[in-house]
Amino acid sequence: MHVSELQTLHISKLLELAEEHGIENANRFRKQDLVFAIVRQMMKKGEGFTCSGTLEILPDGFGFLRSADTSYLAGPDDIYVSPTQIRRFNLHTGDTIEGSVRVPKDNERYFALVRLDSINGDHPEVCRHKILFENLTPLFPTEQLKLERDLKSEENLTGRAIDLISPIGKGQRALLVAPPKIGKTVMLENIAHEVTANYPEVELIVLLIDERPEEVTEMSRSVRGEVVSSTFDEPAQRHVQVAEMVLEKAKRMVEHKKDVVILLDSITRLARAYNTVVPASGKILTGGVDANALHRPKRFFGAARNVEEGGSLTIIATALVETGSRMDDVIYEEFKGTGNMELHLDRRIAEKRLFPAININKSGTRREELLVPNDQLQRMWLLRKFLHPMDEIEATEFLNGKIKASKNNDDFFELMRGK
C-alpha cells in the first residue's frame, strides 16, 4: 500500500480506519499524527508500504521526504533518509523519491526509507549523470505556451488576450503587475487551467504565499496541478521554507529535461517574508526594506529560464502595486527590470467591469519575435499601432469586444482585416 493513499483520505475516513485498528482517542489526533499511527499499526500486522515525497536535506546531513499534500510542512509521517543514501545516489533537496519504508524501531521517531525505486520518475542510476541546474545554459524562450482554447468562456478570453498582447514562452520570467482586488488571482487560475489543458506534459506548480485559506482551497480544487501554499496566519519563516522547497523541486525536474511552470502569488509578499527573516545588515532602503533582503527572492525569480540542454522553468509571478505601502513600491521597482515579460492590470479598467483588465500599452514581451511566427507578429504590431492612440479603457473595450466576436485569434485577425 502507498502512504499517500492514506494522506489524501478525508479525516472522517481516517478516523474509521483508526477505529478498525484499535487506535484510542483518534479524534484528538492531528491528521499527520493519525496517518503515522495507522501506518504503524498496519505495518506491525505485516502490511508492506511504499512512499513518495520531496526530499529536504537538513544541515546535519540527513533528510526527510515531505508531502506536497501538507505543503512540505514537517510532520510525524515524514520518511527519514539517511546520509549514506543521500551520498550514494547523489541526492539533492527537491528530488522526488519513491521507495519502500520500514516501521520505526524502539528508539526511532520516524519511518525510514529502506529501498529507493525511482528519483524524479527515472531510475536511480540515471541521476548519477545529470547536469546540475546551475551549470545549464540559459536562453531566451523560443517555444510559445499558447493559452488559447476552443471555448467561449471568460477564461479563454484571458488566454487569447495574453496571446495577442504579451505571449508567454517556455522559460519565460513573467511579472503580472496589479493593484489589489482587480482579479489577478482569478487570472492566474485561468492561466493554470489553460496550461494544464493545452500542455498536459508540463509540470505545473501553483505557489500561494500569504494568501487566504479559502482561496487556497478553491485553487487546489479547481487546478489539476500541484498547489502549494503558506497562508497569512503562518510565520514568515514558513513562507520562505515553502518557496525554497518549490524552487528546488522545479530545478531538479529541469535537470531531468522537463518543462516546469510555477505560478507565484505573490512575489511582493514573498519578498516581505524574506525581509522579515534575513539577518539585519544595518542598511535600510526606502520603505523599511533591508539592503540584503531582496537577494533571495531575486534568486527565486531569476531561476526561470529556457535551457539549451533541454527543459525549461517558467515563472509567472504577481507583483502588488498601489497598496499604499512604500515597501511594496520599492519591491516592484527592484523586480521591474528583471523579467522578460510584463502584464499590467489597470484599476480604472477593472472599475468599468472590463475583464481581463489589461493595460495594453504598458504590457509586452521581450524578444517576442522568437516566440511568434513573423506574419502573426506583423499583425500583432499593427494591432498595437491601432490601439495606441486610444484611451486605456477604450482600447481594452475594443479588444475584448473583438475577441468575443471571433472564434479564435486567427479569426480575430481576419475580422480586423475586414474592418
Curated annotation (Swiss-Prot):
Question: Start and end of every Rho RNA-BD domain?
Answer: 48-123
Show the PROSITE patterns listed in the entry.
Answer: RHO_RNA_BD (PS51856)
Which GO cellular component term is one of those annotated?
Answer: cytosol
Which keywords does the record carry?
ATP-binding, Helicase, Hydrolase, Nucleotide-binding, RNA-binding, Transcription, Transcription regulation, Transcription termination
Query: Which family does this protein fall into?
Result: Belongs to the Rho family.
The task this protein performs is described as: Facilitates transcription termination by a mechanism that involves Rho binding to the nascent RNA, activation of Rho's RNA-dependent ATPase activity, and release of the mRNA from the DNA template.
Q: Which HAMAP family match?
A: Rho
Subunit and partners: Homohexamer. The homohexamer assembles into an open ring structure.
Q: Kindly provide the name given to this protein in its UniProt entry.
A: Transcription termination factor Rho
